[in-house]
Amino acid sequence: MTRLTMNIAIATVIAATLAGQASAEPVKIRAGWVVAPASLIPVLFAKPGLARHQGNSYVLEPVYFSASPAQITAMSVGELEIAALGFSSFPFAVQNAGLADLRIIADEIQDGGKDNFSTHYMVKKDSGIATVADLKGKVLATNGVGTGVHMAMRAMLQRSGLQDKRDYTVIEAPFPTMKAVLLDGKADMIVSTTPFVFDPELQARARVLFTQRDAMGTSELSFWTAREGFMGKNRAAMVDLLEDSLRAVRWYLDPANRTEAIDILARFLKQPPARFESWIFSKNDFYRNPDGLVNLDALQNNIDLMRQLGIISTDLDARKHASLDLVGEAAQRLK
């Protein structure tokens, strides 16, 4: 091969490589969410300038689901890249849905973390119920049997010697209807969370008997998960996404941006801004770790409690399913 021919060949290879890189499509990352603003996924990049890698290395596609089990199904069939799961759903994804390669990659919200808001279990002020033991023979409302808040309820009552069905009755009601369920006498105790717990009438006529933190300590309510194979093939794009997401979360948490942040949420949820002003992005809200770090000790305690209550049949080591190195790398970029 002559020198000229060799140079032409090298130039051709370089040109082809550069063309391939230039035409490479950004990685589509579909991310599931269930409830906003607990999950910020649908509004994460509503503020221009936060998603600096969006459209280059990745494209984020928020996908709404009515409940966590639907995300697990979507993940199983390859229709979702990131599932926002919690302590009460993650073990089922790993143990029952065949997602042994599912990894915990970033935090979303914690109940009771850093002395922030914890879910309230409330009774009427004139009910005569002063202690958990007074719930014997009563009707208790939860948003769903088997949910995290139901598990906390069971744990707290069991601590006082009360067993489900034997000592009390559980009914189901959506969170928005809980106030009416309590005040109309359909249940003696309800579960209430943000924003419903701040309803003026509920605050005036009911009181907190205990919180979820009282029942089980800090709870890992929601965290991002992804499959190991996808992360291995698309590590750079995932780190870019996590960098942008941390930048966005920090922007939302900054008191200087609170008015604009509330306006974004209000527009998305079609609610008046006043509905959020007393609690969102404050101590009255669930804790959001600005570095995206999952509290693995809390998560392990949550999972162990599930085992003790017989909700899951085998032990699960949360740390063996955690891959927090990506979010750690993303956080380092923002320093």
Go through each PLM region and give its residues.
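Secondary-structure end/capping motifs
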Residues: G232-S313
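Cleavable N-terminal signal peptides
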Residues: A11-T12, A22, Q54
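Bacterial N-terminal signal peptides that target proteins for export
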Residues: M1-A9
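Pocket-lining segment of extracytoplasmic ligand-binding domains
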Residues: S88, P176-F268
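Short, glycine-/small- and polar/acidic-enriched structural segments
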Residues: E25-Q163, T169-E172, D188-V191, T218
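Conserved C-terminal helix/tail region of periplasmic/extracytoplasmic solute-binding proteins
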Residues: I303-K335
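Sec/Tat signal peptide C-region and signal peptidase I cleavage site
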Residues: L18-A24
